[in-house]
């Protein structure tokens, strides 16, 4: 089998060849002989199934396997002829032609390799910025929010009606078309009015109710409601209000509250709490600054400065993803056109190509920067992050991890964590200032 190769650029190579029907037939026979040694077929002892029987029963599957084997041979030869190694290969080859004819198969495919990336001089691309300031009013507002969260609930004595901000203890049962539905009933449920935890109209309908009163509230489930059997349906909830509670927010934190918000401190004080709040706000502001301003500026400058060829197959995957994300925004006519007209589809995909190439290029730049700066994320850190996400959303952590593993998402999550860690380090002005100070003292 003679294979011709053509270098499209430094990382993409086009390979073409013609596979004879005899080569496929020979490969099919080899696979059939191998399968006959282990296959179980009724009427024959295991390991004694005639090859002719295997061929007759599984010819289609064996032919597919043989063609895949031959394609792998083409890829192996293309790698050698391109002067590369197997480790240089990235992703799956793009098979652009596989034309079956009577006595041959014409094959054309593109293999892609990892690019060589040089990020020398990246330091000059880091945008100038000042560490965000934390004002006293920011700390006071955060502390007030904290006080509100931990303040105890107290039962309201009197006959006033329920208002926004109150906590209602009540029974409810929901009905659609006069029939109670699963999950629509609870007793002594506590709900903050105005928190929007329930569907639109529910909490508003309770405002003004008094303790001991009953009311029917008419609502409509949102069209995108999670339970398909309720989405878009009109419903009636029968309500009975038992208690009205409100938070009694203290003017100042007492010792018990300080221990609650600073559980690991031997001597929790309000001053220490304010320091922690200040640091939390500072980190939030830095995170916002990095993600909304610094990172986009750095990424744009890096893609412009570091030019290199990118793997075609990875770019096509990125285009696939961008196209899928945009699909719901297309008109029905456009969707029909893209399904039926290959040229129109190809033209539309090309609109995403430049952004896709830049996105892939940035991924390789980030990967190299992480290597240069020694930024790593262990598999254990990935698992911990997934577990934390599960705990926060009330899900089973092991099942959550398994879901990501089955979806093949773990490498992407790890890359995302490396990226976040890298940019946090790149834009850590305080760390750089400390390094500079140490260097000056040493000199």
Curated annotation (Swiss-Prot):
Involved in protein export. Acts as a chaperone by maintaining the newly synthesized protein in an open conformation. Functions as a peptidyl-prolyl cis-trans isomerase. Its EC number is 5.2.1.8. The keyword Cytoplasm applies. One of its GO terms (cellular component) is cytoplasm. It is found in: Cytoplasm. Keywords: Cell cycle, Cell division, Chaperone, Cytoplasm, Isomerase, Rotamase. It is an enzyme of class 5 (isomerase). It comes from Campylobacter concisus (strain 13826). Belongs to the FKBP-type PPIase family. Tig subfamily. The gene is tig. One of its GO terms (molecular function) is peptidyl-prolyl cis-trans isomerase activity. One of its GO terms (biological process) is protein unfolding. This is Trigger factor. PROSITE patterns: FKBP_PPIASE. Residues 165-250 form the PPIase FKBP-type domain.
